[in-house]
Each structure stands twice: as C-alpha cells, then as structure tokens.
C-alpha cells in the first residue's frame, strides 16, 4: 500500500451528514425530582467532576451552587471545574474529598464525578450512605460484564443520564433558592519555606505568574490542592487517566499545540520519573515552535513506590531502610537540563538552593514569553504534602 500509485481523487463526502449527535436531554420529571431534592436539602453538596472547558458551563455551575448555597468539592484528578477561591468551595481539590464535610451533606449532586461509589464509601465507610444521591453522568453507556473500567456502582435516588453541561442549566431553572450561611474556611499555611520543596516551588511560581493567564497541564503527585487557585476552566487540565508515569511532557506539549496563539502560557509541573520517561516530547515542541514550560519537581526517586515499599516493609516486619532499592534515581545523578538542551530547549538547573529558585523561574518564564521551550530542574525535598492513598499526608524520608 505504501508504494502504490495514487489514483484519481475520490469524491469527498458531504461532511454535514457525519456530525456528532446532539447531547441527550433528561426527562423533565427526573429533572423536577432532582430539583426538589436539592431545593429542600438541609446541607446540599456538589461533586464537580468531569465537565467541559466551556466558560458558559463554568458560570452555570457557579450560579447553581450559589442558588442552592451548596458546598462544592473538586477533584485534583480532573480539570478545573469550579473556582477554588469561591466561598462555597469546601476544601482544596484533592484525590479524596474531606470525608467529614461530605458526610454533613444530606443531598449529594454528582456531576460526572470519577468513582462516585468509592468516594461515598470513603466518606461513610460500612454505614449506609446517609445522603440522597443525584447522579449526572453518561457512565452507564460503558457498563458491561467484560471489564470494570467504570468503578463501583453508586446508589442514585435520581439519575440524569446526560452530560453535566446539559443538566446544570435545567437544574438551575428548576431549583428554588436556599438561604444559608457560608462557613469560613481555614486559611492556608503561611509558614516560611526553609528548603526547596514542592510548596516552595508553588509559592515562587505563583508570585511570578500573578496576573498571567497560565494553563497547568500536569501536576505531580505531591502537589497539595491548596498551593494554587483555579479561576478559569483552562487554569488546570487534570491528571493523566490511568496514573501512568511518563505522560507529563507529552500532555504539556499537546496543550501547547492546542493553546498556541491564545495568550495563555502552558506549564507542566512534573516529577523527575515522569520527565525521564517522556522527555522526548520536547523535540516535538522545539521542532514545531510550541512555547511551553516544564518544571521538574525532582526528588531523585520514583517516590510513590518508595512509600508503597515502606508500608509493605512495616506490614511484613522487614527493614524499612531498604525502601529505596529499585526506586532511587541517583549514582549517577542525571542532568535533566542537559537532556532539554540536547533537544533544542532551554535547560536551567539543577536548582538546589532556595535563594536560586525564584530567579531561575523568572528566567524560565522569559524564555517562554519569547516563544521558546524551557525546562527547569528543581531539586525538591522528598515527601508529599498531599494524601495520595486516602491516608494522611506522607512523611518525608
């Protein structure tokens, strides 16, 4: 086929006959049932999950939350779905929502949330789910016996089998306003950074990008959702679907292609393992002139597996000191900045001192503003400031 001669051009079909179908609209009685549950709730909650990048959809979700005075939870695995600095945003986006806050709800509206069943189970444990549940999702289309890609089957007192962007305006029109006092949220920690950490990296980055339109294409596992606010549907694009290592650079370059010329700077904050497994995507970015910035939160380890190996060692009575074996990326050290330069990108680092962090990031931002690709190797302390397995934040090694 590759060597075959090209014959006459075929007649091109009328593409208007192959359009995507219109979104399904749920039955009115189901909308009214859901609206009644929400309107009469004592403490409604919204799980804002997989939604579109539409600004109209973003505004509709805000309007619905404000009309209901509902607490809103967002997921660090999915793209920005609600302004995280809004008074109704219950807690920083996380892999697992705050179970106590969720248990306070008597009605839960799940907007295509990833693993609603697992989230409710984590909040209520073995007890019956104490809240009425309204599901808005098209997940049931993939339910079958062959696989379990769709996670557990959650309870649903009303199921609107449509996309959230379709359901939210219908609910907004049908619900009655609720009067409720908005509870204040605890302030984020203002402790001074004493070493280069992911938190220090986030603070320096936030200061330097204040007022800029930035799209975060990827965040590392140790990122705490409180580190940066999301105020637009393109502020954050979510995590890779399966949690695989190596997606970060490619996701960043792909986002840079999609947003080229938009005025929004694409930034991927990735781990060193993620960068090492996918860094050849940089060549595509430099070849096609797709400006973007990759900040490598480099803890010199596949650290998530160090945590797993530590837990297994404790459970089996084995030496915890061996947790690094097969995971530590050291001896020899890898020059990540040189790997970037080898592909035509600017490479900065390794940045090991706190005093060099902000100037290095400032230089990197200037490269990207000039239309270049830049990578900064930031040597962060090992450890996570965010729970990644349903438990407490992980200790440093």
Question: Where is each model-derived feature located?
Answer:
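A short, conserved beta-to-alpha structural element at the edge of catalytic cores
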Residues: 145, 289-318
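Acidic, Ser/Thr-rich peripheral helices and adjacent loops at domain boundaries
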Residues: 307-332, 397
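Glycine-rich phosphate/diphosphate-binding loops that line cofactor/substrate pockets in enzymes
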Residues: 30-44, 64-67, 102-104, 204-211, ...
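Conformationally flexible catalytic loops at phosphate/diphosphate-handling active centers
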Residues: 1-40
